[in-house]
Swiss-Prot record:
Residues 201-265 are annotated as: VHIID. Interacts with IPN2. Binds to RAD1. Interacts with RAM1. The lineage of its organism: Eukaryota, Viridiplantae, Streptophyta, Embryophyta, Tracheophyta. Residues 88-104 have a biased composition (Low complexity). InterPro entries: TF_GRAS. Residues 106-491 form the GRAS domain. Residues 323-414 are annotated as: PFYRE. Residues 64-106 are annotated as: Disordered. GO terms for biological process: nodulation. It comes from Lotus japonicus. Residues 281-313 are annotated as: Leucine repeat II (LRII). A motif (VHIID) lies at residues 232-236. This is Protein NODULATION SIGNALING PATHWAY 2. It is found in: Nucleus membrane; Endoplasmic reticulum. PROSITE patterns: GRAS (PS50985).
Length: 499
């Protein structure tokens, strides 16, 4: 799969928004300005009138053009006919808006509540004291009559994926489900056409701050942590196509005295040769991109064990390098990674005492509680995700449906299967915050510039997003009252910290 990584030139802050809130400016209501950043980075380079990020995905799709939906002009969220229809609908909505709840909205709310009750009853019928497989079967038949993956309201589409997950558990397939074999990811194993996966990734970038929030927070912290270093070594747990690092390279290259950057990506032998080949191709493209910037750069990979655990002995270290561990976990576009694999990576970080450890993770409920309790928490979480996408792009139904089908649907099915298989606890865990503290890591404070950057990012999206500072070292992305994902900063750089 060819990819022109030359086209990733910025952090995708173009100074405008296609969404519903006010565009960000030099002085917005967050009290942040693009012109007031740490001198470590030339942020002006990231706020020009560039829109090259999309060329990356476009070029990847062009090289894999097999003709599925969204393949001809990816990120085009609708066809010309749909745009005309949407323009008409928008006009009608504008002229008929009232402050009262319409009968249609009331009906949707009633149906949504009914679906929630049916889903909860279905979950209860599959486990616990009230387990009744025949009742579960009847409930699922009724749910299938009421929902659709492609039509209807947000709640109806969401319920369709949860119904699919419950059906898999009832039939026994879900209990043995392994999301790494079904989750549709860029550059990874999947059952969707590659063009659909690439298109969905670009659309997810356009529709929400989920991916950018983690990348930008981690990158800003890294730049600050290595400001005066001559050599930097980043160990990346799940590099995918390397999109995160192109923007960091540009930040480092903007400093005349910037450091040499080395990235070690982990490859997974358990997935076969494809994983290693993908990592090597990512390294080739990142190397070419660094050369185009004049950024000193080298790339290596380290293979995980067959059980996906990490052994630090396989890591090549050079004296004088500032070591950074980067860990992106279970975001919508990423493959699920087991807690044992993640723990082995973080344990290695503890042994090697890096300058900084960045952890970006999905915010889920506690790993405690039974299946029904965690089922409802998952329903609440994904309801917030679906709502946030619709609020940002209310008219682009086909685009949202693609993101839901490629990323969110498989994530729902896989997550519920793991919860069910472990009886509600165990493998599917909550935040890594307590684990890191118990292991001896200490938090690294999030800088005011980093927090300000997050607020500016959210200014490009719908007003329902907000960022919360949790403690001094963690930023949490919210949709309204629901936590979606977080970015936290850690270190274990001294013997006393890691004892």
């Amino acid at each position: 799969m060819e990819m022109d990584i030359d086209c990733i030139h910025h952090l995708d802050f173009s100074g405008h928004s296609t969404l519903t809130n006010t565009p960000s400016s030099d002085n917005d209501n967050y009290g942040c300005s693009w012109n007031h950043w740490s001198p470590v980075v030339n942020w002006d380079a990231f706020t020009g009138n560039q829109d090259d990020f999309h060329h990356l995905i476009d070029s990847m799709i062009d090289d894999n053009n097999t003709g599925p939906a969204f393949s001809d002009h990816t990120a085009s969220t609708t066809s010309e006919e749909e745009e005309e229809e949407e323009a008409t609908t928008t006009t009608m909505t504008t002229t008929t808006t009232t402050t009262t709840t319409t009968p249609e909205a009331a009906d949707d709310d009633f149906k949504g509540l009914r679906l929630v009750h049916l889903l909860m009853a279905g979950a209860e019928a599959l486990t616990g004291a009230n387990k009744n497989r025949e009742l579960a079967r009847v409930i699922l038949v009724r749910l299938k009559e009421l929902v659709s993956h492609t039509d209807g309201t947000n709640m109806e589409r969401l319920a369709a994926y949860f119904t699919e997950a419950l059906q898999g558990l009832l039939e026994g397939a879900g209990g043995a489900y392994n999301s790494s074999s079904k989750h549709h990811v860029i550059g990874g194993p999947h059952h969707e056409p590659q063009n659909d996966a690439l298109a969905a990734f670009q659309l997810l970038q356009d529709m929400s701050p989920y991916v950018k929030f983690g990348h930008f927070t981690a990158n800003q912290a890294i730049v600050e942590a290595v400001a005066h270093e001559r050599r930097v070594h980043i160990v990346d747990y799940d590099i995918m196509e390397g999109v995160q690092w192109a923007s960091l390279m540009q930040a480092l290259a903007s400093n005349p005295n910037g450091p040499h950057l080395r990235i070690t990506a982990l490859s997974r032998s358990g997935v076969g040769r494809r994983s290693m080949a993908t990592v090597q191709e990512t390294g080739r493209r990142l190397t070419a991109f660094a050369t185009s910037l004049g950024q000193p750069f080298s790339f290596h990979h380290s293979r995980l064990e067959s059980d996906e655990t990490f052994r630090p002995a396989g890591l090549k270290l050079v004296r004088g390098e500032a070591l950074v561990f980067n860990c992106m976990l279970n975001l919508p576009h990423l493959t699920y990674r087991s807690p044992n694999s993640v723990a082995s990576f973080l344990t290695a970080a503890k042994a090697l005492r890096p300058r900084l450890v960045t952890v970006v993770e999905e915010e889920v409920g506690s790993a405690l509680g039974g299946f029904v309790e965690r089922f409802m928490d998952s329903l609440h979480h994904f309801s917030a995700v679906f709502d946030s996408l619709e609020a940002g792009f209310p008219m682009q139904g086909r685009a949202r449906a693609l993101v839901e089908r490629v990323f969110l649907g498989p994530r729902i099915v896989g997550s519920l299967a793991r919860i069910y298989r472990t009886g509600g606890g165990g493998e599917e865990r909550g935040s890594w915050r307590e684990w890191l503290r118990a292991a001896g890591f200490s938090g690294v404070a999030v800088s005011s510039a980093n927090h300000c950057q997050s607020n500016l990012l959210l200014g490009l999206f719908n007003d329902g997003y907000r960022v919360e500072e949790l403690g001094s070292n963690k930023l949490v992305l919210h949709w309204k009252t629901r936590r979606l994902l977080s970015a936290s900063l850690w270190t274990c750089s001294s013997e006393s910290d890691c004892a």
